[in-house]
Amino acid sequence: MLDLKLLRDRPEQVRQALQNRRATVDLDGILQLDRERRQLETRKGSLQAESNSLGKKVGEIIRQGADPQGPEVAALRQRGVDLKAEIAQLEQQERELEEEIRARLLTLPNLPLPSVPVGRDEADNVEVRRWGEELKPAHPVLPHDEIAEKLGLLEIGRAVKVAQSRFVAMVGAGAALERALIAMMLERHIAAGYTEVIPPFLVNSAALQGTGQLPKFAEDSFRCADDDLWLIPTAEVPLTNLYRDEMIPAESLPLYFCAYTPCFRREAGSYGRDTKGLIRLHQFQKVELVKVTRPDQSEAEHEKLVQDAEAILQMLELPYRVVELCSGDLGFAAARCFDLEVWFPSQNQYREISSCSNCWDFQARRANLRYKEAGQKGTQFVHTLNGSGLAVGRSLAALLENHQQPDGSIRIPKALRPFLSSRFLSEDGILIPAA
């Protein structure tokens, strides 16, 4: 959530930043509501001061000899009753205005940092670096879904029968391979200082509001309406909200969390895109990284977060590139974001496999997540960061294509082999699909 004081003090700067994001918002409407609220606050303060003085005045005139039951005292007491009623009415109006202002603020996206390149969409994103060589073999590379079905690693038709389209079932060596990827990712991140968490896979509306999925993206989430619970779209939601409405001692920061969870998304608006394979599913597995930091730490921690995600791709020997998102392509809560895109030889293109975002204090304001310096008065909002480390299905898909051999077999990267049962691994590191 944006700081209302920032909107009030620098409206044109905010307006330009939102325009760079291609966000259409009614800033003037929010500022008008804020003016009305402050006018009510001023009026209420004046009435409260008068009410306080009335009590003293009644005592004074009685001490001076006025009849406590007389008309003069009665008039003052009636004025006191009227003031309390008017103050109560103003307080109700003030609460209603505050609720409306907050509701509108919750619809505003985060502001891009000044360093973010200005652009309209993904075509204006800026490539930062590449790692590894793009696989362009002389032999044809089967798409990941075709080679996976051919090797018996996944069931699509039967999963659709059980659920609906955009669901798959990993079986046999496919399930073992996915489990190995998860274990490798978690072990690497834990070794880098992250604390593993197994969070709830269902969260309440307040949690989704805290990280920015609500109210804007309700249609893209699965909801259990009877319980006000939602299936998580990413572990970012429960991890970031672990400390919601809390004050963290400054000496405890930064906090690092990692979690493996299934993730659930309706994929609203993606009709006709990536209808086959593991790229765009309603349910998918992901290892998520979340950091909670002091403001002066967040930019350096952002760079380290990207490197942590890159480390997994390097362990899997997958060629990738790092891209900085332009202002028009930023996610709702991000102030700055780097995407990691992995090479898919069957498509002859890079595809996103991780988004690493610095959300600045945007989520912290929504979730009331603060920290306190020892010996200092007051508290400040933390900065929150998150990134995929990595999306498991897309990692598996990229592995099946980039390590596909001319005979159609799959070479398992050396770093992954210790996590895969020997039943599924030949002596020379080739996947045994039917063990």
Curated annotation (Swiss-Prot):
Q: Which InterPro entries does UniProt cross-reference here?
A: aa-tRNA-synt_IIb, aa-tRNA-synth_II, aa-tRNA-synth_II/BPL/LPL, Ser-tRNA-ligase_type_1, Ser-tRNA-synth_1_N, SerRS_1_N_sf, SerRS_core, tRNA-bd_arm
Residue span of the signal peptide, if any? none
Domain of life, per the record?
Answer: Bacteria
Q: Which GO terms describe its cellular component?
A: cytoplasm
EC number(s): the record gives 6.1.1.11
- Which positions in this protein are listed as binding ATP? 265-267, 352-355
List the catalysed reactions. tRNA(Ser) + L-serine + ATP = L-seryl-tRNA(Ser) + AMP + diphosphate + H(+); tRNA(Sec) + L-serine + ATP = L-seryl-tRNA(Sec) + AMP + diphosphate + H(+)
For this protein, the record's SUPFAM superfamilies field holds: Class II aaRS and biotin synthetases, tRNA-binding arm
Subcellular compartments: Cytoplasm
Record-level Gene Ontology MF annotations = ATP binding; serine-tRNA ligase activity
Pathway(s) per entry? Aminoacyl-tRNA biosynthesis; selenocysteinyl-tRNA(Sec) biosynthesis; L-seryl-tRNA(Sec) from L-serine and tRNA(Sec): step 1/1
A family per Pfam: tRNA-synt_2b
Question: Which residues bind L-serine per the record?
Answer: 234-236, 288, 388
Q: What does this protein do?
A: Catalyzes the attachment of serine to tRNA(Ser). Is also able to aminoacylate tRNA(Sec) with serine, to form the misacylated tRNA L-seryl-tRNA(Sec), which will be further converted into selenocysteinyl-tRNA(Sec).
Similarity remark: Belongs to the class-II aminoacyl-tRNA synthetase family. Type-1 seryl-tRNA synthetase subfamily.
Question: Domains: what does the record tell us?
Answer: Consists of two distinct domains, a catalytic core and a N-terminal extension that is involved in tRNA binding.
Q: Which protein, by its recorded name, is this?
A: Serine--tRNA ligase
Look up and give the organism this protein is from: Synechococcus sp. (strain JA-2-3B'a(2-13))
- Name of the gene encoding the protein in the UniProt record: serS
